[in-house]
Amino acid sequence: MAIGTCISIITLNVNGSNASTKRHKLAEWIQKQNQYMCCLQETHFRPRTTYRLKLREWKKTVLANGNQKKAGVEILTSVKIDIKINTVTKDKGHYIMINGSIQEDIRIINVYVPNIGAPQYIKQMLTDMKGEISNTIILGNFNTCVYQWTDHAERKVIKKHKP
């Protein structure tokens, strides 16, 4: 199927998808969005988990999980898109990189950046990929603020004590 020059991808931090009710509601929501691909972060699956997000008309699923029940990323592709996956690179739950083709070569990277050290993690990831960036889509949860002055995590609360 020709997709022209556009590909629609949704990305969502699900904050865990082990509960069956949550998986079913998530599956219904994704089906209604009518997209070509879906990238999920914080799936919290373990490597040998039997839980899966089951979606009709979604043919390929690629997961990256850590040993613990935290982090985790997933890429789902719809039957509406003819993607040929050549290689998959993943780490322990923080990113998946798919090299493939949809009319031409493309790289899709779904990232869940750790809470601590996010800017350094992102910088290192981009440095490692230097020279391999053409036709690359990087998406996910970067756990960082776009503008430093909007980041409330570093503010300290000063309490005044009355004598």
Model features per residue range: what roles?
Residues M1-P163:
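A shared catalytic/ligand-binding motif for oxyanion handling
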